[in-house]
Amino acid sequence: MTKADLLSLALDDFLTISSEVEAAAVVSADGLPMASALPPNVEEDRLAAMSAALLTLGERAASELGKGDLAQVFIEGPRGHVILMAAGPDSVLVAVTARGAKVGLVLFEMRRIAERVTAIMTAAVGESRGLAAVDDHGDPPAPEPAATSVASWQ
């Protein structure tokens, strides 16, 4: 599977698990769409560009106000929320929710999907260096069991 396929699969899983999420996308920090699951009335390029601009402003505000690294950008409107969360060093997970969404649950699932996106993006870089790739679900390979010596059992 390609990186784009794995990202799309992660977004599809996110929308399936989080029924209150109406749209989701992974965009580059430069504002380019990488994968999306959007309704017809949402333009992928426009969402990606706006998300990158919001992320840049959020990072700058957090830094200049001495609040550390940006964790997420949260926008609330009368009809729902737009939430942006870093997903690796150069990509952003975007979720658009319905009004009344259980934001805590959405954020919980976003963290899980952001970790998966990070693994996919890291594996894409690692593959070019001869490192292990992600599995067909976009998850990193399971770690090898630690070897134990007889002496450690005594």
List PLM regions with ranges.
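Acidic, low-complexity cytosolic segments
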Residues: 1-21, 30-154
